[in-house]
C-alpha cells in the first residue's frame, strides 16, 4: 500500500489574546492635576468678618470662654440650658482669693492646675431648668460679692466634669 500524505489544514484560532504590553498613561482614567492652594481650603471667612478676641496682654486667663467679654444673664442661661440638654448635673463653685490659673498643690503642667474651689451648696441633681441655676447664682453673688463664681457640669454616668466656665468675677477683674 502506498501512503498518501495527509494534508492537515491549519485552523485559525480566533480566541487568541494579544500579549500584555504594560499600562498606558492616562488611557483609562483621565486625570487633571489640581493645584492645592489656600483658595481651595474650606473657610468661614465670608460669614465672620471682624472677629476680635480678648486682649492677651494684661488679662488673666480663667476658664472656658475666658477670652470672651463677660456673658450676660441670658447668655449664661443658654450655657446652662446646653449642659442640661446634655444631661449634665449643674453645680456652682466659688473662690475668694485666686480665680485665675496658678500652681499651688501641683507643680506639673497639664489640664489640672492644683486649685480647689469651694462648692456652693450641693450639686443640683434633678435640675431641669436654667432658672433654678441662675437663682442659685444670684444667691451666691449676694453672699460673696467679691468672689469668682463658676458653673460646672458633671456627667454622673461617666463621673467626669464636662464643662466649666466663669459666671461672675469680682469688680476690677
Swiss-Prot record:
This is Ribulose bisphosphate carboxylase small subunit, chloroplastic. Heterohexadecamer of 8 large and 8 small subunits. Belongs to the RuBisCO small chain family. The basic functional RuBisCO is composed of a large chain homodimer in a 'head-to-tail' conformation. In form I RuBisCO this homodimer is arranged in a barrel-like tetramer with the small subunits forming a tetrameric 'cap' on each end of the 'barrel'. It is found in: Plastid, Chloroplast. Its main location: plastid. It comes from the Eukaryota. It comes from Flaveria trinervia (Clustered yellowtops). Keywords: Calvin cycle, Carbon dioxide fixation, Chloroplast, Photorespiration, Photosynthesis, Plastid, Transit peptide. One of its GO terms (cellular component) is chloroplast. One of its GO terms (molecular function) is ribulose-bisphosphate carboxylase activity. Residues 1-49 form a transit peptide. One of its GO terms (biological process) is reductive pentose-phosphate cycle. InterPro entries: RuBisCO_ssu, RuBisCO_ssu_dom, RuBisCO_ssu_N, RuBisCO_ssu_sf. RuBisCO catalyzes two reactions: the carboxylation of D-ribulose 1,5-bisphosphate, the primary event in carbon dioxide fixation, as well as the oxidative fragmentation of the pentose substrate. Both reactions occur simultaneously and in competition at the same active site. Although the small subunit is not catalytic it is essential for maximal activity. It holds the Pfam family RbcS.
Amino acid at each position: 500500500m502506498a501512503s498518501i500524505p495527509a494534508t492537515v489544514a491549519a485552523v485559525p484560532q480566533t480566541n487568541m489574546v494579544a500579549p500584555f504590553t504594560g499600562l498606558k498613561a492616562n488611557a483609562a482614567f483621565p486625570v487633571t492635576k489640581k493645584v492645592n492652594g489656600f483658595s481651595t481650603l474650606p473657610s468661614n471667612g465670608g460669614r465672620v468678618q471682624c472677629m476680635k478676641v480678648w486682649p492677651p496682654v494684661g488679662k488673666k486667663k480663667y476658664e472656658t470662654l475666658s477670652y470672651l467679654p463677660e456673658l450676660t444673664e441670658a447668655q449664661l442661661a443658654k450655657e446652662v440650658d446646653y449642659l442640661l440638654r446634655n444631661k449634665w448635673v449643674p453645680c456652682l463653685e466659688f473662690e475668694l482669693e485666686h480665680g485665675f490659673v496658678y500652681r499651688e498643690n501641683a507643680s506639673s503642667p497639664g489640664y489640672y492646675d492644683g486649685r480647689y474651689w469651694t462648692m456652693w451648696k450641693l450639686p443640683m441633681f434633678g435640675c431641669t431648668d436654667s432658672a433654678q441655676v441662675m437663682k442659685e447664682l444670684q444667691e451666691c453673688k449676694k453672699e460673696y460679692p467679691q468672689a469668682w463664681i463658676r458653673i460646672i457640669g458633671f456627667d454622673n454616668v461617666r463621673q467626669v466634669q464636662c464643662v466649666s466656665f466663669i459666671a461672675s468675677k469680682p469688680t476690677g477683674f
